[in-house]
């Protein structure tokens, strides 16, 4: 799997999302519970596929946590590609970080890479009011 820049690091076991409202998925049961809750409430969810060894993933973690506070109606989920390879295959993740935006269990957008401006723009697009239903 590709990474937008990687290095070996002596880091914590998971990326640091302290101060944010990010659910860290580490096993299938946790994933199932999280997605059930999302489905019950009809919320938009953003999946961040990342790895501890990926420098852009680590760099994007504080912004992801910040966005989780800015957009409380969106569910933020972090998936470690090394711990959940079946989800990597299911969502066709080919590089880290990859952000997948979902609504009603359907993928509505995808962003590959850790560019902060691009990520912020995706959230702004997602939250813009639509003037017409058919646009």
UniProtKB/Swiss-Prot annotation:
Main subcellular localisation: cytoplasm
Function: Probable thiol-disulfide oxidoreductase that may be involved in the redox regulation of a number of cytosolic enzymes.
Domain Thioredoxin: 13-128
PROSITE patterns in the record: THIOREDOXIN_2 (PS51352)
Family: Belongs to the thioredoxin family. Plant H-type subfamily.
Keywords from the UniProt entry: Cytoplasm, Disulfide bond, Electron transport, Redox-active center, Transport
Active site (record annotation): 54, 57
Subcellular location: Cytoplasm
A Gene Ontology term for the protein's cellular component: cytoplasm
Tree of life domain: Eukaryota
InterPro entries reported in the protein's UniProt record: Thioredoxin-like_sf, Thioredoxin_domain
Disulfide bond sites: 54-57
Species the sequence originates in: Oryza sativa subsp. japonica
Name of the protein in question: Thioredoxin H5
């Amino acid at each position: 799997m590709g990474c937008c820049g990687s290095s070996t690091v002596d880091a914590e076991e998971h990326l640091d999302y302290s101060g944010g409202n990010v659910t860290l998925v580490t096993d299938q049961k946790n994933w199932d519970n999280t997605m059930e809750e999302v489905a019950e409430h009809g919320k938009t969810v953003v999946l961040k596929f990342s790895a501890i060894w990926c420098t852009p993933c680590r760099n994007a973690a504080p912004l992801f946590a910040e966005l989780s506070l800015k957009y409380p109606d969106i569910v933020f989920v972090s998936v470690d590609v090394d711990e959940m390879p079946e989800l990597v295959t299911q969502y066709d993740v080919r590089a880290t970080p990859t952000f997948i935006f979902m609504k009603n269990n359907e993928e509505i957008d995808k962003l590959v890479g850790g560019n902060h401006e691009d990520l912020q723009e995706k959230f702004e697009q997602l939250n813009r009011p639509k003037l017409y239903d058919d646009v």
